[in-house]
Amino acid sequence: MSNRTSLLGAVTLFAVLSSACAQQYTGPPADLVIRNAKVVTIDHDNRRAQAVAMIGEEIIGVTSNRAIGQYIEEGTTQVIDADRRLVIPGFNDAHAHWASLNPDYIELRYITDKNIITEGVRERVAQVQPGELIRGGHWEHEMFTDKQWPTKELLDEVAPNNPVSLSRADGHSVLVNSYVLRASGITNDTPDPFGGEIQRDPVTGEATGIFKESASSLLNYNAVRVERTPEEQAERSRRGWDAANEMAMRLGVTSIQHPGGGNADLYQSMLDEGRLPYRIDVAGRLTDNADALARYDELRKRFPPEGNWIRFGYLKGFIDGTLGSGTALFFEPFEDEPDKSGLAMMPYEDLERQILASDAMGFQIGIHAIGTKANNWILNAWEKAQEVNGVRDSRHRSEHAQVLIDEDIPRFAELGVIASMQPTHCITDKRFAEKRIGLERSAGAYAWRRLLDAGVHIAFGTDYSVEPLEPLEGLYAAVTRKDRAGEEGDGWFPDQKLTMEEAIELYTLGAAYAQFMEDRKGMLKVGYLADMIIMDNDLLTIPEDEIMTSNVDYTIVGGKIVYQRDGAR
């Protein structure tokens, strides 16, 4: 143990004892102090403070303006005068598909005119060589004027000699052009794979260019490889990651839980270079393969849960699709497609077998589950795992837990299952939810209040890049349940709204609990990691229409200022 670690341990213990005994702090001076603030700690034993003191990575004082002076030494301690601004724990995104930013990606989020797709592809074709793959996405057909799915005809005229792949916003459907269909050998007779659907013209039976879920595995892009030198590729990667990291810091995201995978060694190299400004959990894929589980176990030993920066110990699986793509798995058919009730990504027996094997190895498991039947299945499988493997503090997770039947809500608490939810999905999906599943089933959608009242642990995230990496949009969604345009009224199923402080807690302490880190992250408390943000507005008191336009003034990770907004004092 280093002298620095020993010192921090002693300082932490002394600070706790000092607080309990109302003694003066006499330890070493703080490295960083925030004072004259409105500190919302998320610590139920000490909800409010005015100042925070830090040494190294840890918090050593959460106190009043009067008492903070004892932590300050001129010339040693950096002091931020918050001028009564709000200080809260840093946002911990419990579900983000994290990646570097691709400058060549065609961004189609929020478009309402399908012709923008054509023009975006036309512009990109002019910049690439024939045969080079063109990628883009985040389009949402429910936002189009006609609310109809796009088809390959939007792409064929402008990209006859390039493969084009444009993902729907949810990432569960993709639009491709005829170049890709030919390269893939897709014909009218190509069958749908298990857990997937090739969308077809109802008259001709011809593929429209939309491939849902596992059907995308049939696609062969036959793309020309872009030749870059190793130096060019390294610089391109560096720029992409630096842009992504800057975005996270600008938005106050100090921790990321990456359920889709992630390269732990890449993050370690960035950490070693001083370029990793957030903490991150990476994941593996749910399996019952003994060799794969053994490899995951070795990775867990290299990046153990006791670590604070890069951690591994979570396996992710899928059991259904999404509401927007019409592939979420329900007990009853869809209202707008009565011949369909969603797609299972695997038979229940396979799900149960994989969960039993992974649970027996002590892994935390998260399953993508949107529909009522999907969530019921995963609860049943986890109940079986407890019967077979025994009960432990597993904290398995329903990733999304979007639409639930009444009987399953208390089962989350009974089984210790975490509802890992993304509040912006509520205000995105509510545009079409009642059309797809009706009013009665919609009452069980994004049921935050009912889950909390039942004693269920909830963790909030964004599902980036399905939704923007914008925690403030999530907070707005949680407290209003209104669309981003600020519609009139009380919001969609307003009885499920949260208070702002509850929503912040689910983005901080709730997310930390979901990764077994509630003992050292998610609160502003002595001995906890010094991850926090200073806001330009008081989120607890401002009008709801100002929430999404508020800004993070400072982002602090491990006691270091990693972001300061231009013009922020």
Please provide the spans of the model-predicted regions.
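Bacterial N-terminal signal peptides that target proteins for export
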Residues: 1-10
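Bacterial N-terminal signal peptides
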Residues: 9-19
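Divalent metal-binding segments
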Residues: 22-35, 40, 44-297, 313, ...
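His/Asp/Glu-enriched, well-ordered alpha-helical/loop segment
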Residues: 228, 356-366, 370-396, 400-401, ...
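Acidic (Asp/Glu)-rich catalytic clusters
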Residues: 270-275, 300-307, 389-391, 412-416
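Short proline/glycine-enriched turn/loop segments at secondary-structure junctions
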Residues: 303-304, 543-547
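Glycine- and charge-enriched low-complexity intrinsically disordered segments
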Residues: 564-569
